[in-house]
Curated annotation (Swiss-Prot):
Record's compositionally biased regions (Polar residues): 190-208
GO biological process, one term: regulation of gene expression
Protein name in the entry: Transcription factor 19
A GO molecular-function annotation: zinc ion binding
Composition bias, Basic and acidic residues: 138-147, 250-260
Gene behind this protein: TCF19
Disulfide bonds: none
């Protein structure tokens, strides 16, 4: 296996669907792409508006870098060359990466634009299996027609068998199928044979929708969604984002209320509901209406802001000043009223 790089045609066209390049040993070389077949190594012949392709539209510069090739694209056209839908300035070189989309001509989507679209890919293959381009035309004389496309053929005495007998799947098809993104482009790549019979069209492959005909297993139930259905009526579920699990929602630690106006009986308790509620939670009573709090000795705070705390045992509301605890302590720990503490001790 030798390092090579390929240009795979996307969409329709009258040229070859797959070009494989294996530069000769040395510092590097240059390959030309354009509409002049006698000057270029890759002939660009779009089905629509061939005038958008220049005689020498672009050049591929290959330089040796370790065991691989560093390939750059240079634009020489009048209509433009794009790499991944970004126009390349005329005369500017850009290093290509595996999987880049090359557009020769005006900008537009494949199938609707009179441009040539190719996928650039770096592979390791046997160059003779793909009739790789070795000697570029730019190194030969101007009128020499034999200096452009020189395929690497096997040596004398090597078996001349078609690729279909070497493996169940042709090697060209194996490389093309290794790019997952190409399956969405509905390509019809050509496989090459060394027996001299020319390119062969592979059998038409079915679309992804036709291949997956077996019924798939039903997706597992989302436990998070079922938990949200149970707690759908709580205020916490309307405030907390759906991406957070229910266990991360703050359970009960907003029972401490500091209000300028007396709290109203509206609103539900925060947190997960009890499985066996012992009593219905009671909201703090309104100012001036009955007993201010459930403390045996209510001191009736006269401040503008009154702090309330709810017992975690009996759900009864108390003034923070009446039960003798601090606001910070009520926020950080569970609060039990004197009656509940006596019940726990007994």
């Amino acid at each position: 296996m030798l390092p090579c790089f390929q240009l795979l045609r996307i969409g329709g066209g009258r040229g070859v669907d797959l070009y494989t390049f294996h530069p000769p040993s040395g510092a590097g070389c240059t390959y030309r792409l354009g509409c002049r077949a006698d000057l270029c190594d890759v002939a660009l012949r779009p089905q629509q508006e061939p005038g958008f392709i220049s005689e020498v539209h672009a050049e591929l510069h290959a330089e040796r870098r370790g065991d691989d090739w560093r390939v750059s694209l240079e634009d020489h056209s009048s209509q433009g060359t794009l790499v991944n839908n970004v126009r390349l300035p005329r005369g500017h070189r850009l290093e290509l990466s595996d999987g880049d989309l090359l557009t020769f001509g005006p900008e537009g989507p494949p199938g609707t634009s009179p441009s040539e679209f190719y996928m650039f890919q770096q592979v390791r293959v046997k160059p003779q299996d793909f009739a790789a381009i070795t000697i570029p035309r730019s190194r030969g004389e101007e009128g020499e027609t034999r200096a452009g496309f020189r395929p690497m053929l096997p040596s004398q005495g090597a078996p001349q068998r078609p690729l279909s007998t070497l493996s169940p799947t042709p090697k060209a098809t194996l490389i093309l199928n290794s790019i997952g993104s190409l399956s969405k482009l509905h390509l019809q790549p050509l496989t090459f044979s060394r027996s001299g019979s020319g390119p062969q069209n592979p059998p038409v492959s079915t679309t992804p929708g036709e291949v997956r005909t077996t019924p798939s297993a039903p997706p597992p139930r989302n436990r998070r969604k079922s938990a949200h259905r149970v707690l759908a009526e709580l205020d916490d579920e309307r405030e907390a984002p759906e991406s957070l699990p229910p266990v991360l929602i703050e359970p009960r630690k907003k029972l401490l209320r500091v209000e300028k106006t007396p709290p109203t009986p509206s609103g539900n308790r925060r947190g997960r509901p009890r499985k066996h509620p012992v009593s219905i939670p009671r909201a703090p009573p309104a100012a001036g209406g009955g007993e201010p709090c459930a403390a045996p000795c209510c001191c009736l705070p006269q401040e503008e802001t009154v702090a309330w705390v709810q017992c975690d045992g009996c759900d009864t509301w108390f003034h923070v000043a009446c039960v003798g605890c601090s606001i910070q302590a009520a926020k950080e720990a569970d609060f039990r009223c004197p009656g509940c503490r006596v019940g726990i001790q007994s």
